[in-house]
Amino acid sequence: MKFLEKFGFEKKDIDALKENSTSALIKELEAHKKLVSKNLEYLNDMGVTNLIEIFVHYHDMFLMDNSNFVEIFNKYDQKDLVSKLAKNVQIMEYL
């Protein structure tokens, strides 16, 4: 899970994620780290400032095919979406 460090995750964030997730999920994230990184990169490039919080709560979304992942977020005005995500990550459930 060291690959998450380039997105601002600290060791404590990664340790907490490991403690609160199944070993199967951790293996899945590791096995698909290129895909997960690509999806994290997309949100980072969009200007999302709370990547860690979003990832911790909705990590399963980051295993989604990148084109589908991008399509979900492209339905909305990016500035507006970034602002709303900063205020309330729970809107991820409705995207």
Regions found by a protein language model. Give the residues of each.
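Long amphipathic alpha-helical repeat/alpha-solenoid cores
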Residues: 1-95
